[in-house]
C-alpha cells in the first residue's frame, strides 16, 4: 500500500478536490527547527478527508478498486478496524476480529464502510500520482528503482489477512 503522506495536496487542488485556501489554512507547524508529526498527520488527514467527501467515483476509480481487489479489500478493512480501535495491534483485537470470523468481519464492513472507502480513495490517489511521477521521470530518462522489504511486519494487513503463511501460536503470537 502507498503511504498517504506522499499524496500531493497541490494535485488534489488541481483536481478540484481541495482549495488552495483550505490547504493554506492548515497549521502544519511554523518552527522550521522542529517537526510536529502529530500536527502534520492531523492536518494532512483533515484535508484528505475533505477531498474524499468531494470525490465522485468514476470508471477509473472503479477499475482501480477492481484491479487491486485482492489486497485492497483486506487492507482497507484492516486499517479501518485498526483506526476504529485506536491503533492497537491486530493481535490485541477481540477474538472474532483477530481470527477473521466472517460474521464479525461482515459487521465491520458495514459499520466501517465509509472509512474503508476513504482508505481506498487514498490508495487510488497515491497510485495515480505515483504513476504520473514515474512516467514523467521515465520520459526524462530517469529510471526509478526501489527496494522491497524482505519481511512482513507482524502488525500488518498482510499478517492479519494471511495467518496461514506465518508461524503463529494459538494466541496469534509469532513463534
What are these language model-derived features?
Residues 1-163, 167-168:
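Acidic/aromatic-lined carbohydrate-recognition and catalytic surfaces
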Residues 171-175:
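Short, intrinsically disordered, charge-balanced linker/junction segments flanking boundaries
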Amino acid at each position: 500500500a502507498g503511504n498517504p503522506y506522499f499524496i500531493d495536496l497541490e494535485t488534489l487542488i488541481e483536481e478540484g478536490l481541495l482549495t488552495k485556501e483550505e490547504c493554506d489554512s492548515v497549521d502544519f507547524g511554523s518552527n522550521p527547527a522542529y517537526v510536529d508529526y502529530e500536527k502534520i498527520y492531523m492536518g494532512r488527514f483533515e484535508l484528505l478527508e475533505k477531498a474524499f467527501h468531494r470525490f465522485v467515483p468514476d470508471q477509473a476509480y472503479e477499475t482501480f478498486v477492481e484491479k487491486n481487489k485482492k489486497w485492497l479489500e483486506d487492507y482497507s478493512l484492516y486499517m479501518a478496524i485498526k483506526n476504529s480501535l485506536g491503533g492497537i495491534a491486530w493481535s490485541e483485537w477481540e477474538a472474532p476480529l483477530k481470527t477473521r470470523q466472517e460474521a464479525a468481519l461482515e459487521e465491520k464492513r458495514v459499520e466501517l464502510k465509509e472509512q474503508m472507502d476513504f482508505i481506498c480513495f487514498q490508495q487510488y490517489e497515491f497510485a495515480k500520482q505515483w504513476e504520473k511521477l514515474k512516467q514523467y521521470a521515465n520520459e526524462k530518462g530517469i529510471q526509478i528503482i526501489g527496494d522491497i522489504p524482505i519481511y512482513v511486519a507482524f502488525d500488518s494487513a498482510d499478517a492479519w489477512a494471511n495467518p496461514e503463511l506465518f508461524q503463529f501460536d494459538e494466541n496469534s503470537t509469532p513463534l
